[in-house]
Design a protein with these regions (language model features):
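ABC ATPase "signature
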Residues: 101-102
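A short, surface-exposed alpha-helical micro-motif characterized by mixed small hydrophobic
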Residues: 83-85
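Conserved ABC ATPase signature
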Residues: 18-22, 26
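Catalytic Walker B motif of ABC-type/P-loop ATPase nucleotide-binding domains
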Residues: 43-46
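Conserved catalytic motifs of ABC-family nucleotide-binding domains
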Residues: 39
Length: 125
């Protein structure tokens, strides 16, 4: 699974070290790699890139795109740019209720709900 998440070449000579010695990007990939052997039906990722720099975010998002054909992936994020880049469908929730569920591009180009549009445009949140 380390090879699946493109981590093997970076850590193969450091397998005896602590995970905390890895970069934050590598730690995120390691967390994902630990799940893959059990073949989960769903990968739930809560703010998977919130602690990463832009380069680390790009690497983790690329990994998400590579895994999407093999797994159902649900990403919880408040980062609208990431939601647009990393998903095919979006669900906008407010106060625990689904406000809108549609194709990502449709949500960002022509949201059907004013609350969705307001959030995407940064009027609140």
């Amino acid at each position: 699974s380390l090879k699946q998440v493109l981590l093997w070449d970076k850590v193969k000579d450091r397998l005896d070290q602590k995970a905390t010695d890895l970069s934050l990007e590598e730690q995120q990939k390691l967390c994902i790699a630990r799940l893959l052997p059990v073949k989960p039906g769903l990968l739930l990722m809560d703010e998977p890139c919130s602690a990463l720099d832009p380069k680390g975010t790009e690497a983790v998002e690329e990994l998400i795109w590579e895994l999407r054909g093999k797994y159902t992936i649900l990403i919880v994020t408040h980062n609208m740019a990431q939601a647009r880049r990393a998903s095919e469908e979006c669900i906008f929730m407010l106060m625990g209720k689904v406000v809108e569920h549609t194709a990502t591009e449709d949500m960002f180009v022509t949201p059907q709900n004013q609350e969705t549009a307001d959030y995407i445009e940064g009027r609140y949140g």
